[in-house]
């Protein structure tokens, strides 16, 4: 079943599992998710549910978006994403009306999820740090230590060439993370391991696409 919800990364902590092992977890706040739009194949060419999360002020919202939020009878949202799923896949999101609140009971403890977020920006970095390339020789007479090497043709550079530049601040997805605990009163997910981005960063939590085998699940745990 395809499910999805938006949240904000609170931080990391540690909890004990049933076996008495200390496990690192990430706390994600998933409160106040609102359905903004239901898209279907006939009108939009694909099926998806548009979700909004985290209120923002009206003066920072454009008039077209204010009208969009007014149709959903909700306050303007800062973080908006679409949860896509094919028409033959069962999803509780498709049954919700526009303006409905999405509760945390879409997921259960033990579910595997894919978490998507924006990684931390690390500024300008060279090829060695950014792409894990090897350095040049450092013996006497060598003048090639940390350079990126040949960039290809004289005019322009090859597409996809690994060069120095802005490191981080990219969309990253970590797959098959387990939900260890759900706080229904405070709308918090405790997800095993780390998720992309800094604290207070927005993330999208979706049902895992790739199913793990028993051997892979045992190795992951």
UniProtKB/Swiss-Prot annotation:
Quaternary context: Part of the 50S ribosomal subunit. Forms a cluster with proteins L14 and L19.
PROSITE patterns: RIBOSOMAL_L3
Biological process terms in GO annotation: translation
Source superkingdom: Bacteria
Protein keywords: Ribonucleoprotein, Ribosomal protein, RNA-binding, rRNA-binding
Name of the gene: rplC
Entry similarity comment: Belongs to the universal ribosomal protein uL3 family.
Coiled coil, from the record: none
GO cellular component: cytosolic large ribosomal subunit
GO MF entries: rRNA binding; structural constituent of ribosome
Function: One of the primary rRNA binding proteins, it binds directly near the 3'-end of the 23S rRNA, where it nucleates assembly of the 50S subunit.
Protein name: Large ribosomal subunit protein uL3
Disordered: annotated segments: 123-156
């Amino acid at each position: 079943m395809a499910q999805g919800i938006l949240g904000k990364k609170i931080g990391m902590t540690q909890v004990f599992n049933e076996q008495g092992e200390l496990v690192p977890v990430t706390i994600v706040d998933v409160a106040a998710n609102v359905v903004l739009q239901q898209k279907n194949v006939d009108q939009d060419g694909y099926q998806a549910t548009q979700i909004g999360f985290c209120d923002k002020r009206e003066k920072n919202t454009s008039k077209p978006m204010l009208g969009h939020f007014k149709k959903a009878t909700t306050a303007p949202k800062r973080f908006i994403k679409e949860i896509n799923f094919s028409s033959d896949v069962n999803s509780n999101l498709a049954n919700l009306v526009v303006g409905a609140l999405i509760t945390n009971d879409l997921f259960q403890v033990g579910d595997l999820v894919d978490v998507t977020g924006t990684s931390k920006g690390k500024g300008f970095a060279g090829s060695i740090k950014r792409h894990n390339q090897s350095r040049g020789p450092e013996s006497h007479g060598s003048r090639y230590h940390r350079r990126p090497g040949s960039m290809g043709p004289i005019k322009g550079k090859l597409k996809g060439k690994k060069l120095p530049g802005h490191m981080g601040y990219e969309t990253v997805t970590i797959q098959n993370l387990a939900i260890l605990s759900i706080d229904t009163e405070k709308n918090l997910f405790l997800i095993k391991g780390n998720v992309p981005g800094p604290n207070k960063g927005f993330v999208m939590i979706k049902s895992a696409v790739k199913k793990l085998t028993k051997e892979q699940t045992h190795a992951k745990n």
